[in-house]
Amino acid sequence: MALTELKGQTGGTQRVVIERGPVRVFAEALGDTDDVYQQDEAPVPPTFPFVMSYWGSFGTGGAAGLPIERLRGPGRAILHGEQAFEYHRWPEVGDVLEGTTTITDVYEKERSNGGKLEFYVTETAWRDATTQDPVVTAIFTLVINVRPPQPS
């Protein structure tokens, strides 16, 4: 698949209800034992929006409606590159959010061994489902390590 085929692709809109259980489990997995995550109206941990894009996507071959599985193949490994978050307000338990993910940039770098690295930058804009006010934008870079061709 050519890199240019994916740039600008949008994965559609997904709806997420932030529930206390997943927030608590996520905080515990990070080793964050702050009591604030045990409350009924708890805020989410700072990196929690990353996992929201994957809710409901297991077994679908994608995340947030994007064709992640189409990037896999022989000699290709998917790596987590970078992530960042722009908060407009802090999400919390009870929020119902709608997120739209777009691939905003694609590029590649050649490696000295004949392989290459492909970079896919995505942005997921999460909005309040009722007011449509922006809540958080999650920016994520997916890296595909493409091994060099093997001699036959």
Predicted region positions:
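Hot-dog-fold acyl-thioester-processing enzymes
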Residues: 1-82, 149-152
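HotDog/MaoC-like acyl-thioester-processing domains
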Residues: 1-2, 82, 87-152
